[in-house]
């Protein structure tokens, strides 16, 4: 028996700690926690319409907000889940959101009505597959052009940049949609598209899913939970009040954006740490990899080495090839990183900090959906070029609230979100264009590195 903070009343039943829950994280022993209750969904794994991979990603965790945000169009999943209830969760691995407002409920109802009224499927449209076909075509054509069509050094340097940009588009369109299961209703589609990400980039799709879906999307800008924030007390940049400021942070607004170009080093090595070394991606535990995941990981690494080094060596000298490779990797890393950073690390956005991994993590006295509005900004609405070249990350607010809806529909949903925000007196952060979004990011880095009062501002709270 224990007291529920949410209901302020005594609840009886079998209790499980988060560490006990974490042990049940395989296909044959799959538990999850949702809204304080624990469910043994092992029998549901092979029956899940969204495929077993999504459930195995969630296995052994509290997935309350993941469950809510991935089932916005129907209440049926909630009724099905009740059949598998076995007890209650008594402790939490990461901070939990203890507030529930009417904001998200109202918003989901409006979005449902929109899709019903317009007779659209949020995961199926001709535009989805034509867009993905285009980015596949671009990445393979530019790969060929950059590696096998010219011996001119300067032309090849230019082609390396073009290939890197197309590689970024491939990641922000195909990989991003796949990791959120936002493409079609057939799990095999995003499963194999995810595997193609390993093949093309040499980075692990499964590792990215843990960092992005399980970590960043649920604990956006929550330090020691969101893997996208620096976890160490000493880091190359300071973006949260709990980090230690060093002398070099005074210049972080200059050097940090440049260092984003080496993000691909982390991109392609963190999966080794996650799968082999310590089984974690930042603060996020990595689920047990299936045989398919292991095969994709190994084949992806081998194909990356073969197609980026071994095969092109027949056409270029080693030194020239390394030069082209470094140029492409820098542009690829910078373009990906800056697109994600401007959406969350910027002026006027909130950061939530927690103590250093206590046995019972802090509660966040905030509604999860409202936190997404406080930690996220959009930019460049109305620009088709901005939308395409950002993979619709310029509509980041809608994406965080409805990650399982394909990005093609984001512009349609913006007016709905803005309307509900206005009704609930919630600020919708948006910049007019990409340039101003970048400047907001750089200004934030400058203030965190130079203004003592700025870094000492109180942490975000319910009343902010």
Swiss-Prot record:
Q: What is its EC number?
A: 1.14.19.-
> GO CC annotations?
plasma membrane
Membrane topology according to the record: Multi-pass membrane protein
Q: Where is the Cytochrome b5 heme-binding domain?
A: 13-90
Any transmembrane segments, and where? Answer: 125-145, 153-173, 318-338
* Superkingdom to which the source organism belongs: Eukaryota
**Where does this one sit in the cell?**
Membrane
Q: Which cofactor does it need?
A: Fe cation
Q: Which UniProt keywords apply?
A: Electron transport, Fatty acid biosynthesis, Fatty acid metabolism, Heme, Iron, Lipid biosynthesis, Lipid metabolism, Membrane, Metal-binding, Oxidoreductase, Transmembrane, Transmembrane helix, Transport
Where, by residue number, is the motif Histidine box-3? 396-400
Q: Where is this motif: Histidine box-2?
A: 212-217
> SMART domains recorded for this chain?
Cyt-b5 (SM01117)
Report the top EC class in one word. oxidoreductase
Q: What is the protein's major site of localization?
A: membrane
Q: What is the recorded function of this protein according to its Swiss-Prot or TrEMBL entry?
A: Specific for desaturation of the 5 position in C16 and C18 fatty acids.
Quoted from the entry, the domain comment is: The histidine box domains may contain the active site and/or be involved in metal ion binding.
Q: What is this protein called?
A: Delta(5) fatty acid desaturase A
Species classification: Eukaryota, Amoebozoa, Evosea, Eumycetozoa, Dictyostelia
Gene behind the chain: fadA
């Amino acid at each position: 028996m224990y007291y529920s903070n949410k209901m302020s009343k005594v609840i009886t039943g079998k209790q499980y700690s988060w560490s006990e829950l974490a042990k049940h994280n395989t296909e044959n022993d799959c538990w999850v926690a949702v809204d304080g209750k624990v469910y043994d969904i092992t029998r549901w794994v092979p029956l899940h319409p969204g495929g077993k991979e999504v459930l195995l990603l969630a296995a052994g965790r509290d997935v309350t907000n993941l469950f809510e945000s991935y089932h916005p169009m129907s209440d049926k999943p909630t009724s099905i889940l009740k059949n598998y209830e076995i007890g209650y969760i008594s402790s939490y691995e990461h901070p939990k959101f203890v507030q529930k407002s009417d904001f998200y409920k109202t918003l989901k109802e409006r979005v449902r009505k929109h899709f019903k009224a317009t007779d659209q499927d949020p995961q199926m449209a001709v535009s989805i597959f034509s867009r993905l076909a285009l980015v596949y075509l671009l990445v393979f054509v530019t790969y060929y052009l950059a590696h096998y069509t010219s011996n001119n050094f300067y032309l090849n340097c230019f082609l390396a940049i073009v290939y890197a940009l197309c590689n970024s588009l491939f990641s922000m369109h195909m990989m991003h949609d796949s990791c959120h299961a936002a493409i079609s209703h057939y799990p095999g589609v995003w499963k194999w598209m995810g595997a193609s990400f390993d093949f093309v980039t040499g980075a692990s799709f499964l590792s990215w899913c843990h960092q992005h879906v399980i970590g960043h999307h649920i604990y956006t800008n929550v330090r020691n939970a969101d893997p996208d924030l620096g976890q160490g007390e000493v880091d190359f940049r300071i973006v949260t009040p709990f980090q230690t400021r060093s002398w070099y942070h005074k210049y972080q607004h200059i050097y940090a954006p440049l260092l984003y170009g080496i993000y691909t080093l982390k991109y392609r090595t963190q999966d080794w740490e996650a799968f082999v070394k310590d089984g974690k991606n930042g603060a996020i535990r990595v689920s047990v990899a299936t045989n398919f995941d292991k095969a994709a990981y190994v084949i992806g690494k081998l194909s990356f080495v073969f197609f980026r080094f071994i095969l092109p060596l027949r056409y270029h000298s080693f030194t020239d090839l390394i030069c082209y490779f470094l140029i492409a990797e820098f542009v690829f890393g910078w373009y990906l990183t800056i697109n994600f950073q401007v959406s969350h690390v910027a002026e006027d956005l909130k950061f939530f900090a927690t103590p250093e991994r206590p046995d019972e993590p802090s509660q966040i006295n905030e509604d999860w959906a409202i936190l997404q509005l406080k930690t996220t900004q959009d930019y460049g609405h109305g620009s088709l070029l901005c939308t395409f070249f950002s993979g619709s990350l310029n509509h980041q607010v809608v994406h965080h609230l409805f990650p399982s809806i394909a990005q093609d529909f984001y512009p349609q949903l913006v007016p709905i979100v803005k309307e509900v925000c206005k009704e609930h007196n919630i600020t919708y952060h948006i910049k007019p264009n990409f340039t101003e979004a970048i400047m907001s990011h750089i200004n934030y880095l400058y203030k965190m590195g130079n203004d003592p009062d700025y870094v000492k501002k109180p942490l975000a709270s319910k009343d902010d």
